[in-house]
Amino acid sequence: MLFLKLVASVLALMTIVPAQAGLIGKRSVFKPKVMIINMFSLEANAWLSQMDDLYANNITVVGLNRLYPQVHCNTQQTICQMTTGEGKSNAASSIMALTLSPKFDLTETFFLISGIAGINPYAASLGSVGVARFAVDIDLINSVDLRELPSYFQSSGWEIDTDPYENGSSNEIVYPESMPYQTNLYELNNTLITAAMEIIKDVVLEDNEKAASYRKLYNESAARRPPFITQCDTATGDNYWAGTYMGDFVSNITNVLTNSTGHYCTTQQEDNASLTALTRASFDGLVNINRVVIMRSGSDFDRGAGNITALANLLNSTGHVSSLACDNLYHAGAPLIDHIVNHWSYWT
């Protein structure tokens, strides 16, 4: 009986090992032209279900999120996809694990960070896609509960290494004397962003009745538009926030840190962390930080409309259109990926 079990185990291994050996035999090191980075399963499925052949190669990488332990690549190994897990910690650790993996050569790879986000109704509408030039970390602040601050304070937070009394009773956010964390602000390659926008600017995005109906509650002209693609900037914070006061605070931080060249429109939980990992990898020549594009699609508004309170807006699933937002990430990103892969000399 023991002998039969041993034979069965050996036969089982014989069926598994050749498949693994075949995969490595094709190419011991994967060198994709594009790496798609998603944060959770709904975003990933929009790509894996619509882009052909991404399950052709499934590469387990040490250090990835246990929920998403594999990188998926097409047959030609030109396009790959990974999922980091949500939040800064997951994003930074997963991307660092990828860049350090000996299974990949990412020195010439373009990275497309593709995820859903809260959206500023003054900048865009549900289902719209924002392509960011700046990523601002809104967690790196001093903060005191408003109930324990003087009444003239406009928000409960202000930039670290600044004096909240510098402008007297106005309590305006001011530019910090230094940025000791070095991750407060990232500016992406504007030449790349401009080229990407030129390719995707006329893409027609999907819409649905749910999104259209909810948009009508808002007075802002951008919020009432059908989904569209725009160049605007993104704010990173682990807190899932909502409300006009928080929205104004995030807009103010973006304006100050970018010297009024940035325009906040999307809020999410990962991008500064992802860029930190990619930047460190770039320092050592493992990736090229100038080859990163961030696309974020609005799944919900960052503040309520009319009499809808911030709390109601945050908890109200009626105004959330995550599936539409994920589909539009694919519709906006796929033409760019196609152009990069099929016109490689243009991009390099």
Curated annotation (Swiss-Prot):
The keyword Signal applies. InterPro entries: Nucleoside_phosphorylase_sf (IPR035994), Pur_nuclsid_perm (IPR009486). Keywords: Endoplasmic reticulum, Signal, Transport. One of its GO terms (molecular function) is purine nucleoside transmembrane transporter activity. Residues 1-21 form the signal peptide. It is found in: Endoplasmic reticulum. The keyword S-adenosyl-L-methionine does not apply. One of its GO terms (cellular component) is membrane. It comes from the Eukaryota. GO terms for biological process: nucleoside metabolic process. Probable nucleoside permease that transports adenosine and guanosine. Belongs to the NUP family. This is Probable purine nucleoside permease C285.05. It comes from Schizosaccharomyces pombe (strain 972 / ATCC 24843).
